[in-house]
UniProtKB/Swiss-Prot annotation:
Protein name listed in UniProt: ATPase PglY
Region Disordered: start-end pairs: 1205-1263
Gene behind this protein: pglY
Disruption phenotype: Strain is no longer resistant to plaque formation by bacteriophage phiC31 (a Pgl- phenotype).
Function (record text): BREX systems (bacteriophage exclusion) provide immunity against bacteriophage. Part of a type 2 BREX system. Previously called the phage growth limitation (Pgl) system, it confers protection against bacteriophage phiC31. The bacteria allows one cycle of phage infection, but subsequent cycles are impaired, protecting the original bacterial colony. The system undergoes high rates (10(-3) to 10(-4)) of phase reversion, i.e. loss and regain of phiC31 resistance.
Length: 1294
């Protein structure tokens, strides 16, 4: 396919560009020739017509008001300020060429005064850079300009004459007055005579004395006659003029270079206005270029800037009420000085300068020359096709460019914040320069350049690439940097100078040499490729030069982004935008893959140069270049001692451990991972596999049964070994192992390339340097000052991150997880996995990370080891099943096993869990809502038991082993226990430990290794139902419903516990009833009644506990005992009442007042009736009559009967006997302690049982009656106050 034509074939491109091609100096702009030159190529736009209208209106207003006015002519670099002034000069001077341009008709029609008023203007250009003061450049520049226009015109009086007059006085003293007068240009006496007749003027010594003694005067509006001066002021002015012209002609030139050689700017403006008027001008127009730039270059001399800035207002205001003619000043500026002051100055100085600038800005008009018309100007001046056919070719190429894709297209158009327009039409005008390029050009040029316009830079780029740039190719933004850097211009601020110099140094000493060495080419090769590509026949060098050119453009774009970060296209630069700005510079085999290629290049550069930093995100990566000027290499050189084998191995192991996710254990490193939904562990060992001293055979063997050991070699060897020797070592070990080989696998990497290994060693040095902050500050970076140490540390930290990222990427290739690149690894080794056992399908998965890759390998190993392991993570969530999950699953499995149809509805929250665990484990099937139990494990275990002749208990160990039949499943212990426990529920088996049934059944976590499962014999269903009914009736508790082995044990345990709880009380009841059977009239031979039921109840309880502790068979017998016990004619309800009330009844019988009750027999018919009633209750069972109530009631009734009987038998009281006194005491008794006997008066007892029981008393009575009386009285007290404590005292008195 034919190549497109060179761009020079369709657009006129000069071979070389000179400054005069596009730059118009101010001196030229204010001359007829300069105006003609400007008009010839000038492109008039609508906006420029508005600008001319603004300028002319300002001039007209100044003339009409006879007031000085000023305006900022604001425009960025290359916006055509000089051309504007040249055309303005042509319009003001009535130039025919200007009037012939029809584009100016609207302006000339509006400003007809230009042709009708006959006004004459003096336009004075100024270039302010290098000025020592405003007066020096403005006033001195005026004198210089006027001398060129009118050599005969008198010199305006703008100089301070102190030094001039001192020189004249010295010359008079040395040479004499005659010689001085002659040198002033007069003939002495002869001229004096002519003067008397008014025909001429001649100096005399007297006139010299008068002139030298006169005061300097610059009063506005005062005309000085210099032809025939007569006043002292006129003589002084005449002397200054003649001396400057004839006697000391170098005075004005010397004064022009002296900042103190001029009068004040305010006075000077009045002087030159008067002077211009004397020359016949109606207005004085001052065009000052670079005034703001001049102040900006001196911004750090705050006093100077403040002084000079305060003078700016003199252009519109002055001490004089009115100048001779209006002074109109146009001050060109690219940047508002107020912005620069804010950036470069701080504090009170900033405030003072800002106030001054604000004052001036408020009095100045502003005419803005837009950059947005630059596309039209560039098209007209540079990019116009040669002819119609060429225009069609350019249009076709542009349409092809529009197909680059939306993201690239948007980047090429630039940002809406751009200054040059951002639409397709603008792009078409500037093609092959994109709007983003144009915007960058304007910003960069404004920041760095002074003497070259944007058009010149564009022309220079076209000229430089005229032999290689073809139609359809865009001019890359990166090509702009070399053009700017080679120009020799420096930025106008010190801070930018430092950054620019740092960028230039970085590019020339590091970046460009690195790119050249990367492709093994030289500067001569590049020069040959650019200018004589056909002569470059070496394909390798040709491709290297092509790759270098693209990379160089990218690097130069990064430098531009650091120099002008405010450019929208370069701000927060992304990889995608970096490629788009240099569209076509990086070629990819697949369209759209350029971003990945550039991203890899940037990552490599960031690892090499600390100034380059990767930014952004994985989805939208970016890059930033920071210029600091800090000597980082010296810090690295000081830390070079850390580059040793030990540190290299340690860092490699650390990086691999972090990437692989390896945990450091006490005995070995371990890899924790999830495989098929279960948590697993593999053993890891790092080392040189080929070195048997470093890794002996025993270090390659797994330490724990069932685990795999993965030996990971490092991607470099300090000795002579390589990956092939690593493979040979494993093969030798494999041959030595016979039978079942060890579960060992070696992961062998390819070695790093020489370049990448050098980068890794650099990473070791930087990592160690940054590891110890104290050592970094005192040893490695001790030669730097504190600020540079901090910057160096930040740069090294950034580079460490880049090198880490690079190393990890290279490691990924080395271990076979990414496509091997010769720049990163040695690409001749692919046998990365070598296992001792034969493992099918043992391959690496391309594109995985090291973290995922090793888990993929470990999963393959476990698949080989446990081929039948179920997948408990079907959704690949990477989460492992936990014991808490199995507890929930088991609860639902048990519930299903207890259901008659083997299915239950599972709560919605647990259905996902049942699908994940129960299904793959073959415990059952979880459907939409219901879980249905499976018979798989029951059939599986029973079949194995039959085939192996196993009877009796099935141990947990045996059943766990059987889960690996016919193929190993390798279930974790807690999952194997879940399976066995589920089988226990399915097959209705009970857990036994040490031969004893575990009741209740243990939780999953409580199952021990030596536990076993036993078949539980079941009672007949009728017995089960009868026992359940009787248990609930007799004992009042709820029995289990399902007739299952575990339930039988549970039920038996409930029966036995209940029987044991009541047995002793039932026995006590029988004992008490038998002890009082005679009194209560109980027939001990009867088959019915209370005593008979109590005895049968005791027999029932004894029968229920007889089989306790006899295992599963005993449990069955216990249930059967309850079901088969002969209750006789008595219902279970009455048995239950007898048993449950046994304790209370036995206690009542034991504590009954039998002596009181026995008295009833001697109380006649009433007493006998009471006893008969009590005995009838005692003979009936407890459900029929409550014996406790009967005993208490009978006691009360007996006591009441006794009281009634006593009251009826007591005679009337006898007269009270007189009590003996001391006089009645006989003294003839033999005792020495005679006493008066006390005889208590008998108190009659209450006639009824009512009333309050006596709490004390005493009487004299006979012994026979005392028993009955005391018993009756105390019985009543016992009834009313059973807990009262009493004291009994008695003695024989007769």
């Amino acid at each position: 396919m034919a190549q497109p034509p060179l761009l020079r074939d369709v657009i006129d491109i000069k071979e070389s560009i000179s400054t005069s091609d596009f730059v118009l100096s101010l001196a030229e702009a204010t001359t007829p020739a300069g105006a003609q030159h400007a008009l010839r190529d000038y492109v008039v736009t609508e906006r420029l017509l508005e600008n001319f209208d603004e300028a002319l209106a300002l001039i007209k207003s100044s003339l009409d008001g006879h007031r000085s006015k000023a305006a900022y002519l604001h425009g960025s670099f290359g916006s055509g300020k000089s051309h504007f002034m040249a055309v303005l000069y042509a319009l003001l001077s009535g130039d025919q060429a200007a009037r012939a341009r029809t584009e100016f008709d609207p302006v000339l029609t509006k400003h007809q005064w230009l042709s009708t008023d006959g006004k004459k203007f003096l336009l004075v250009p100024y270039h302010m850079l290098g000025a020592k003061a405003l007066e020096q450049r403005v006033l001195g520049g005026y004198v210089t300009h006027v001398k060129k226009l009118c050599p005969e015109a008198p010199t305006p009086q703008v100089y301070r004459t102190d030094s001039l007059f001192a020189d004249i006085r010295a010359m008079r003293a040395n040479m004499g007055d005659e010689a001085v007068i002659r040198a002033l240009g007069t003939s002495g006496a002869d001229d004096a005579e002519e003067d008397e007749w008014g025909e001429g003027f001649a100096w005399t010594p007297q006139l010299l004395d008068t002139a030298l003694a006169a005061e300097e005067s610059h009063e506005a509006g005062v005309h000085l006659n210099l032809t025939n001066p007569s006043t002292p002021a006129e003589l002084r002015a005449k002397l200054v003029n003649d001396a400057g012209t004839n006697l000391l002609p170098g005075f004005t030139q010397n004064a022009a270079e002296d900042e103190h050689g001029f009068i004040s700017l305010d006075a000077g403006l009045s002087v030159i206005a008067e002077h211009a008027k004397s020359l016949g001008y109606d207005g004085l127009i001052l065009f000052m270029d670079e005034l703001i730039l001049w102040l900006a270059t001196l911004i750090h001399d705050q006093k100077f800037v403040a002084r000079e800035a305060s003078k700016i207002t003199n252009f519109v205001e002055g001490g004089d009420a009115r100048r001779a003619i209006p002074v109109m000043s146009f001050i060109a500026r690219q940047r508002d000085l107020r912005e620069l002051v804010g950036e470069e100055v701080s504090g009170a100085a900033e405030s003072s300068i800002q106030d001054t600038l604000n004052l001036a800005s408020g009095r100045f008009d502003k005419i803005t020359l837009e950059d947005r018309k630059l596309p039209q100007i560039a098209h007209a001046r540079l990019l116009k096709p040669k002819d119609a056919e060429a225009a069609q070719q350019v249009d076709a190429a542009f349409e092809q460019t529009k197909r680059v894709g939306p993201q690239v297209w948007d980047t090429l158009l630039g940002s809406e914040k751009g200054t040059t327009g951002a639409d397709a039409e603008s792009f078409r005008l500037t093609y092959p320069f994109s709007p983003a390029f144009m915007d960058t050009l304007v910003h960069i040029s404004s920041a760095l350049q002074r003497s070259r316009t944007g058009l010149k830079l564009m022309g220079q780029l076209l000229a430089d690439h005229r032999d290689e740039l073809r139609l359809g190719q865009l001019v890359p933004v990166g090509d702009l940097y070399p053009v700017i850097a080679q120009g020799g211009d420096k930025p106008f601020t010190d801070s930018l100078k430092v950054v620019f110099e740092a960028a230039d140094k970085l590019y020339k000493t590091k970046l460009r040499p690195y790119l050249l060495s990367s492709y093994d080419i030289t500067e001569d090769d590049v020069e040959q490729y650019r200018n004589r590509p056909e002569s470059l026949t070496d394909p390798k060098k040709l491709n290297g030069c092509r790759m270098f050119t693209g990379d160089n453009r990218l690097v130069c774009t990064l430098l531009l982004s650091a120099l002008a970060p405010s450019v929208p296209a370069l701000s927060e630069l992304t990889i995608r935008r970096l490629g788009a700005l240099n569209h076509g510079s990086v070629l990819a085999p697949i369209p759209g893959a350029e971003v990945g290629i550039i991203k890899n290049k940037v990552a490599e550069w960031a690892a090499r140069f600390p100034e380059i930093k990767e930014t952004g995100t994985d989805a939208n990566p970016g890059v930033r270049l920071e210029l600091s000027g800090v000597d980082v290499d010296s810090v690295i050189a000081n830390a070079q001692v850390n580059d040793n084998p030990g540190n290299r191995v340690a860092l490699a192991r650390r990086l691999l451990s972090e990437e692989l996710g390896v945990e450091h254990g006490q005995l070995s490193d371990q890899l924790g991972f999830t495989w098929r939904g279960t948590a697993r562990t593999a053993e890891i060992v790092f080392g040189n596999v080929a070195d048997e001293d470093e890794l002996p055979d025993h270090d390659l063997m797994p330490q724990e049964e069932g685990r795999w050991r993965i030996a990971i070699d490092l991607p470099f060897d300090e000795g002579e070994w390589g990956p092939v020797e690593d493979v040979n070592r494993v093969q030798r070990l494999r041959e030595r192992q016979q039978g079942e080989r060890s579960r060992t696998i070696a992961w062998l990497p390819a070695h790093l390339s020489a370049t990448r290994f050098a980068d890794f060693r650099r990473l070791v040095v930087i990592d160690k340097a940054l590891a110890d902050e104290h050592r970094f500050d005192t040893q490695y970076a001790g030669h730097l000052n504190a600020d540079n140490r901090s910057r160096a540390k930040g740069l090294l930290e950034t580079q460490r991150e880049a090198l880490l990222k690079q190393a990890k990427g290279a490691f990924k290739q080395a271990y076979g997880l990414a496509q091997k690149q010769a720049a990163d690894v040695v690409p001749d080794f692919d046998d990365h996995l070598v296992a001792l056992p034969d493992v099918d399908g043992l391959t690496l998965s391309f594109g995985q990370s090291l973290h995922d890759g090793i888990r993929h390998v470990a999963g393959k190993l476990l698949t080989h080891q446990y081929p039948a392991h179920p997948d408990l993570d079907p959704d690949a969530t990477g989460t492992a099943v936990k014991p808490a999950d199995t507890k929930k699953v088991f609860a639902h499995v048990r519930a299903a096993a207890e259901a008659r149809d083997g299915r239950i509805e599972v709560p919605a929250a647990d259905r996902k869990l049942m699908q994940r665990i129960a299904g793959p484990l073959r415990l059952g099937q979880q459907k939409e809502a219901y879980f249905e139990l499976s018979r798989y494990w029951g059939d599986h275990f029973r079949q194995l038991a039959r085939s192996q002749g196993v009877t009796g208990d099935l141990s947990l160990i045996t059943l766990t082993d059987w889960t690996d039949r016919p193929d190993p499943r390798g279930l974790p212990d807690f999952l194997a226990r879940l399976v066995v426990a589920a089988f226990a529920e399915m097959d209705d088996r009970v857990w036994v430990r040490g031969g004893t049934v575990l009741d209740p059944a243990p939780e999953l976590a409580a199952i021990k290794d030596h536990d076993a499962l036993r078949s539980q014999p079941l009672p007949a269903e009728s017995d089960w139902d009868t026992a359940r009914q009787r248990f609930e009736t007799v004992f009042g508790a709820k029995p289990p419903a399902l007739r299952r082995g575990r339930m039988v044990n549970q039920f038996a345990r409930q029966i036995i516990e209940a029987a044991r709880d009541y047995r002793d009380h039932a026995a006590d009841l029988v004992h008490q009833l038998e002890a009082h059977a005679s009194f209560l009239g109980l027939d001990q031979t009867a088959d019915t009644g209370r005593l008979a039921l109590a005895r049968r109840s005791l027999q029932l309880l004894d029968a229920l506990t007889a089989e306790a502790g006899k295992g599963a068979a005993g449990a069955k017998k216990t249930v059967e005992a309850l079901a088969s016990f002969d209750l006789g004619e008595t219902s279970a309800d009455r048995y239950g009442t007898s048993i449950k009330k046994a304790r209370a009844v036995a206690e009542a019988v034991a504590s009954a007042p039998w002596s009181t009750l026995e008295l009833a027999a001697g109380l006649g018919p009433e007493g006998e009736a009471l006893l008969d009633s009590l005995r009838n209750v005692a003979r009936d069972d407890q459900r029929t009559a409550d014996l406790r109530d009967a005993l208490a009631r009978t006691q009360r009734e007996v006591v009441a009967l006794i009281k009634r009987t006593q009251a009826a038998a007591t005679p009337p009281p006898a007269p009270a006997a007189s009590q003996p006194t001391a006089g009645d005491l006989s003294l003839d008794t033999p005792t020495s302690d005679p006493r008066i006997p006390y005889t208590s008066q008998e108190t009659p007892t209450s006639s009824g049982g009512a009333g309050t029981a006596r709490t004390s008393g005493g009487r004299r009575t006979t012994a026979a009656r005392a028993v009955t009386d005391l018993q009756a009285e105390l019985s009543d007290l016992a009834v009313r106050h059973p807990e009262a404590t009493i004291e009994i005292t008695w003695r024989v008195v007769e």
